[in-house]
Curated annotation (Swiss-Prot):
Highest taxon in the source lineage: Bacteria
Sorted UniProt keywords: Aminoacyl-tRNA synthetase, ATP-binding, Cytoplasm, Ligase, Nucleotide-binding, Protein biosynthesis
UniProt-listed PROSITE patterns: AA_TRNA_LIGASE_I
Organism encoding this protein: Mycoplasma mycoides subsp. mycoides SC (strain CCUG 32753 / NCTC 10114 / PG1)
Taxonomic path: Bacteria, Bacillati, Mycoplasmatota, Mollicutes, Mycoplasmataceae
The name this protein goes by in its record: Arginine--tRNA ligase
EC number: 6.1.1.19
């Protein structure tokens, strides 16, 4: 695995620190316009007291040591003790050849030999996906791509909540729509789901069963015929799971394993996990309720698993599910992408799994906060379909897959998000999605022009590439691997978007001021075409992580 220029500089500084018994970590920054050097470090400032030397005096020692590496064209010392370095052109030229030889693998980290299981979306199969699910889907799928790029084995999982009262309510909701579609006066209970999507399913049921169930009664959460209730539950689950899978596929989200809550009950996983807790002396009774000793692993209080009426609390099937998942997947880490309203649930889940003998840190929760749509400066409620939510299918019709994915990935998932619909439909540089895709369109345009003129890009010597923006951009491209590592470690999708914007900002400025195809200087033109190919490749690699497409022309 090749070493980046920043890694090279860091390693050189670290070696000098070890020679001088300096324990401080070198800090490196990229200089704008390469003045007075490509990279700078404050290591001499922050460590001078440790070795009883003045910063400028220490900087001179570092300079002489760096010169011995034969990697630097120039080393400048700036008051009060900064080191500014310019690497040799042949080192810089390796960036382009590395990018174009590795292609889609550029930026890949070494194999970690660790497996991450990531569960995301996991919307109840009770209707269409809404914009909140969309944010969860984007954060989850981008993290999947990041972890793969960072060298992990990655398993993707969707947990289907197909047991519990919400499915009973779904069955009644669909049943009422079925009756209404038969022109039978059927009053919808207040707790039923809203939306015209249930009309579509009702028509499918009528086509198969006609008036067969017209005389059956119902309550708020039950059809008063067990077999019919079970039938409507299963038909509804199957229908909406199919819809959800298609909506995710249309949104460029692929999830391989779909696990079932009902299966946890059917295979007696809850009884099994209770026996495990009992064998580990992790349970006790109080006021006829069964408690789990979660305070042993940092929870603020012990948690009830079985209430005094013998019904289960929410956490018990969740613990059984996760214990089963740990055994089935053999993953080193489970990551769940959950809505922000689950925050108080995290510690008790981690403690519950630790009481089963698992690593307390095996379960990690990534929180995803709410999304609010903004149009004309105020909150926007889409009204195309009945219901209280903003449906994913509707917003995709308005803004498209790429725009929505990019914007949802561009902000920290821990923060509430205002999604400006006016901004992401603009066709100018103020729209970050347009700005990013326009860069790929410009790259393709340049390469197409060169192809028409029969000018072939060169990848070898790039010593002639000495424009400050070329050098700055080469360094940014070279840093892609570091961005991947930091983004994966921090679970930070927005860092990839920030990186894309940084490339595009420098590139658009470069494009505006430089004549890239100059038939009077073919050697430089060919080198610049190789440079453009490298820029395009890194953008495409970053786009792939976000799950959006490069654009050929705009």
């Amino acid at each position: 695995m090749s070493t980046t220029i920043i890694e090279m500089f860091y390693n050189d500084l670290k070696n000098i620190c070890q020679k001088l018994n300096i324990t401080k970590e070198p800090i490196i920054e990229i200089n704008k316009n390469n003045t007075p050097g490509l990279l700078s470090s404050s290591i001499c400032l922050i460590s001078s007291k440790q070795v009883n030397k003045k910063p400028l005096e220490l900087a001179e020692i570092f300079k002489q040591e760096l010169l011995l590496t034969n990697s630097y064209l120039n080393i400048d010392i700036a008051a009060p003790g900064f080191l500014n370095v310019l690497v040799k052109p042949e080192i810089l030229s390796n960036v382009i050849s590395n990018v174009l030889s590795l292609k889609s693998k550029y930026g890949n980290l070494e194999k970690q030999n660790k497996t991450i299981n990531i569960e995301y979306v996991s919307a109840n199969p009770t209707g269409y996906l809404h914009v909140g699910h969309a944010r969860n889907a984007v954060i989850g799928s981008v993290l999947v791509n990041l972890f793969k790029k960072a060298g992990y084995n990655v398993q993707t999982e969707y947990y289907v909540n197909d047991a519990g009262n919400q499915i009973n309510v779904l069955a009644v909701t669909v049943f009422v729509h079925y009756l209404q579609a038969l022109n039978i006066d059927a009053k919808k209970p207040e707790n039923c789901y809203a939306g015209d999507m249930y009309d579509d399913l009702a028509k499918i049921i009528i086509n198969k069963y006609n008036y067969q169930f017209k005389d059956i009664k119902y309550t708020d959460n039950k059809i008063l015929d067990y077999n019919v209730h079970s039938l409507f539950k299963q038909i509804s689950i199957d229908y909406f799971l199919k819809v959800i899978k298609q909506q995710l596929a249309d949104f460029n989200v692929k999830i391989k394993h779909w696990s079932s809550e009902q299966e946890v009950y059917d295979t007696h996983q809850i009884e099994k996990v209770l026996k495990l807790y009992e064998s580990k002396d992790a349970l006790y009774y109080k006021d006829d309720a069964l408690f789990l000793k979660t305070t042993q692993f940092g929870d603020d209080k012990d948690r009830v698993l079985v209430k005094s009426d013998k019904t289960y609390t929410y956490i018990l099937p969740d613990l059984a599910t996760h214990n089963l998942r740990i055994k089935r997947t053999k993953a080193d880490k489970l990551i769940n992408v959950w809505g922000g309203d689950h925050h108080g649930y995290i510690k008790r889940m981690q403690a519950g799994l630790a009481l089963l003998g698992n690593d307390p840190d095996i379960l990690e929760i990534q929180m995803v906060q709410m999304v609010r749509l903004i149009k004309d400066g105020s909150e926007y409620k889409m009204s195309k379909r009945k219901g209280t939510a903003v449906w994913l299918v509707d917003i995709l019709e308005l803004v498209g897959v790429d725009a929505l994915r990019y914007m949802l990935a561009s902000k920290s998932s821990n923060s509430h998000m205002d999604l400006d619909l006016d901004l992401i439909t603009l066709k100018n540089s103020s729209n970050p999605v347009y700005y990013a895709q326009y860069a790929t369109a410009r790259c393709h345009s340049i390469l197409n022009q060169a192809r028409t003129k029969k000018i072939t890009p060169l990848v070898k010597e790039t010593n002639l590439l000495n424009n400050p923006k070329e050098i700055e951009l080469l360094l940014v491209l070279d840093n892609f691997k570091e961005v991947i590592k930091n983004s994966a470690n921090n679970r930070s999708t927005q860092q990839i978007c920030d990186y894309i914007q940084n490339i595009c900002k420098i590139f658009h400025s470069y494009y505006a001021e430089i004549k890239i195809i100059d038939e009077n200087n073919l050697q430089l033109t060919k080198l610049r075409l190789g440079f453009i190919k490298a820029v395009l490749q890194v953008l495409e690699n970053a786009f792939f992580i976000i799950g959006i497409q490069p654009v050929l022309e705009m």
